[in-house]
Every structure is written in C-alpha cells, then in structure tokens.
Regions:
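Short catalytic/ligand-binding loop motif for oxyanion handling, primarily in non-cytosolic enzymes
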Residues: 1, 135-136, 200-201
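Phosphate-/polyanion-interacting regions in eukaryotic proteins
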Residues: 1-7
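Generic detector of contiguous secondary-structure segments
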Residues: 11-17, 188, 193
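Conserved core of the PLP fold type I
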Residues: 12-156, 166-168, 172-183
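Walker B catalytic acidic pair
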Residues: 163
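Conserved core segment of the aminotransferase class I/II
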Residues: 184-233
C-alpha cells in the first residue's frame, strides 16, 4: 500500500497509451516468456499486446484467429479450464477435445494426446497449458513437449499456449520449457499470459497476448491486425 501510494503521488498526468499497451510492459513480458537473449525477440519475430488478464489475452487471440482461419476447429485438453471452451465458442469456433489425463497414473497421457494431434487437419487450433495444467496439475516432460511441437509442425496446427502460472511449478525459466521449444521450432504460435497469480494482483487483470511470427515484416502486419481486434473488443 505504501509503495502504491508513493507511485500514485509521483506519477505524471496520464496520457493515451498505445493501443497494444505500454512498450516497457510488453518488452518485460517478452523477456519473461522468451528470455532476454531470445533470438525471436532480437529478430523482431514476436509482437505483444497488453490484455485484461489471461482471459482477455485468450479472447483477443481467438478473435484474431477467427479473422484469419474462420473455419478452424479449436481443440482443448480433456479436462481443461472450463472457460477455455466458453471463450472460443463465444468467438464463434466449434470446440472439441484431445485426451490429456490418465486417472490411473494421475499423470498426463502424452501418448494418447500426441496420437490425437497427429490425426487433426491442418489449421486446427490447439490450446495447450504451458505449465501447471488446470485442473489436473499434470504436466508434460520436456521430451513429451518436443513430440507435441513435432506434431504441430507435421500437421500444420496452430498452437495457442496458455501461460497462467509461470513460476509455480519448477521456477520461472523451467516453466517456460514449452514456450522455448516452440520458439526454437520456427513455428508461428500464440501465448496468452496471466500475471494475476504470479504478481498477486488478482484485482488488476494483468495479462498479455504474444504472437510469434515468421519474420519482422510479418510481425508488423500481425500487429496491425491485432490493433484492429483490440479496438473492437
């Protein structure tokens, strides 16, 4: 409370922020997700926009994908955070599931999950829990994530990683293993970030959407379309 009061008293008048949010905030989000020395940041292959929590980031991403791939089907894990289905259905997508949890082992059923991904049509959107799977808490190993990345590449799938609990499993950097593997793959993908839990700012709706592209030029085009989506939300 003391720190908040000091910042409020010292703050200059508030002007308009960019549509995509404060540059410093978006840069910090990228450094946290991808690492400060990330090649995709250095090459301008990622764009980030501030969002109203992870929910807002998911919805902005869903609306953008709907403009680009309107006939896609979205696949979420079985089980998944209940709002995943509601968000993508509200954006106009049919939503199906891929197998994820094995109640006998109380762990992830990676074999069944990857087999399902390898059967999906190109252009399908795959919502993935980057760490701390909700509601099971069962995460994939690094080797299993590598197989997921390979399946997405082979089938031409659209990965959408939901990072709501970075730092709550094994630490900030270890929890980014899925993001790092996708970054190294050369694929385009989406990442929704929520910092409500990480920063204990539950009432502030602190989130972001990051989109990894194929080039700096493509990033500029994606950012232009992303701004249009944000302005209409």
């Amino acid at each position: 409370k003391t720190a908040e009061k000091a910042r409020l008293e010292a703050a200059p008048p508030r002007g308009y922020q960019p549509i995509e949010g404060p540059v410093a905030y978006n840069n910090a989000v990228q450094n946290l997700l991808f690492g400060a020395d990330s090649a995709i940041i250095r090459d301008g292959r990622v764009v980030t926009a501030q969002a109203l929590g992870g929910t807002g980031a998911l919805r902005i991403g869903a609306d953008l994908i709907k403009r680009v791939v309107p006939g896609a089907t979205v696949y979420i894990s079985d089980p998944s955070w209940e709002n995943h289905r509601a968000l993508f259905e509200a954006a106009g997508f049919p939503v199906d599931t891929y197998p994820y949890y094995n109640p006998e082992t109380r762990g992830a059923n990676a074999e069944a999950m990857i087999a399902k991904l390898n059967s999906l049509p190109a252009g399908s959107v795959i919502v993935l829990h980057a760490c701390c799977h909700n509601p099971t808490g069962a995460d994939l190993t690094e080797a299993q994530w590598a197989e997921v990345v390979k399946a997405c590449a082979n089938r031409g799938l659209i990965p959408f990683l939901d990072m709501a609990y970075q730092g709550f499993a094994d630490g900030i950097e270890p929890d980014a293993v899925a993001v790092n593997l996708f970054s190294a793959s050369g694929l385009s993908f989406f990442v929704s970030s929520s910092f409500s839990k990480s920063f204990s700012l539950y009432g502030e709706r602190v989130g972001a959407l990051s989109i990894v592209t194929q080039s700096k030029d493509e990033s500029a085009r994606v950012l232009s379309q992303l701004k249009r989506v944000i302005r209409t939300n």
